[in-house]
A protein has these predicted regions:
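Polybasic, lysine-rich low-complexity intrinsically disordered segments
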Residues: 7-13
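ATP/NTP-dependent adenylation/nucleotidyl-transfer catalytic domains that generate, transfer
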Residues: 27-63, 73, 77-80, 84-151, ...
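Conserved G/P- and acidic residue-centered "switch" motifs that form tight phosphate/ATP-binding loops
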Residues: 68
Length: 319
């Protein structure tokens, strides 16, 4: 029987480094059936981001745009911070940093998001730098697809952190709660300073994106609508050329993010409940459940190094 890792006692705070333990407390089974108020989610993410910038004397938000769902939704949040707090004169700088493994669909979607949401933006191709670093690293040991992907992620972060340094800003993180719990991110790579969406499961990020292009940016001729709609429908990849089908292709082929989220939440809440564990095993297959949970356990070491995340209970209507 799989058992839940003991939860540490944490003080309630807006920002927590080990975000999952505090977030999971607000996802009780009987409450999780209630609909999330995505207006409240979005407004909270905008206001908390602005508060953090102001409190720490920061003037710019730096975001690497991949063209995917998470970075596009984060871009919409940053855009709204600039719009709602003009007196602070915040700057939102977006940069697309592709290598040869990024698809044309991703690059086009990133371009849409930059033009729609950023106060300043550009594209910087890092393929030449990647090949140079890769060749240097391979002088002693051969690289693997994962190590090559990590080089790309870390090169991007070098670029973004340098930009944050010279503009008095911080680097925005775009990982979601599903990725945090599966370890689908690179230490010193795509994990950054501050994460507005880190308390949302992946399927909830989809719902937030849908809310934005159906309730907030509703003009179909507007770049904001087009960017969000494109990101909502884009084919998921890992952005580093490791696995063409993205996260789900690696651990749960044929399953959706919502199903994987159900596996993770059930295990983390009810890992010692035979009936609940049997439910997910029957629903998704014992092999799939074990693959997901093995990935979660093996990535535990990564979750010791987390960015600042907006606490879920500030916007979750299930609280």
């Amino acid at each position: 029987m799989l058992s839940l890792i003991p939860k540490p006692k944490l003080k309630k705070s807006i920002f927590v480094n080990w975000c999952f333990r505090i977030c999971i407390k607000s996802i009780e089974p009987e409450k999780s059936k209630k609909a999330m108020n995505y207006k409240k989610v979005f407004d909270t993410m905008v206001s908390e981001t602005a508060n953090y910038l102001t409190k720490n004397g920061l003037k710019s938000m730096i975001l690497g745009l991949s063209g995917g769902l998470d970075s596009t939704v984060t871009a919409a949040i940053c855009h709204e911070v600039v719009k709602r707090y003009p007196e602070q004169q915040f700057k939102f700088i977006g940069v697309s940093l592709p290598c040869s493994t990024n698809t044309a669909e991703e690059n086009d979607s990133a371009s849409l998001a930059m033009k729609a949401f950023c106060t300043e933006y550009w594209v910087e191709n890092l393929q030449a730098q990647y090949l140079l670093v890769k060749a240097t690293c391979e002088q002693r040991y051969a690289s693997t697809p994962i190590s090559q992907g990590n080089i790309k992620a870390r090169l991007r972060m070098i670029y973004l952190y340098n930009l944050a340094s010279v503009t008095g800003g911080l680097v925005m993180d775009t990982d979601n709660l599903t990725e945090h719990n599966l370890g689908f991110w690179t230490i010193h790579g795509d994990v950054a300073d501050y994460n507005p969406i880190g308390g949302l499961w992946k399927h909830e990020v989809y719902e937030l994106c849908k809310y934005l292009f159906t309730e907030v940016f509703t003009d179909e001729n507007c770049p904001s609508y087009q960017a969000l709609r494109a990101a909502y429908g884009i084919t998921p990849t890992d952005g580093n050329g490791v696995e063409a089908g993205g996260d789900m292709a690696q651990i749960a082929p044929g399953h959706t993010y919502e199903e994987v989220d159900d596996i993770l939440k059930t295990y983390l809440q009810h890992g010692d409940d035979e009936q609940e564990m049997k439910r997910i095993s029957d629903a998704y297959g014992a092999e799939t459940v074990e693959r997901v949970l093995t990935r979660h356990r093996k990535s535990e070491f990564k979750r010791k190094r987390m960015p600042l995340v907006i606490e879920r209970s500030l916007y979750d209507t299930c609280e």
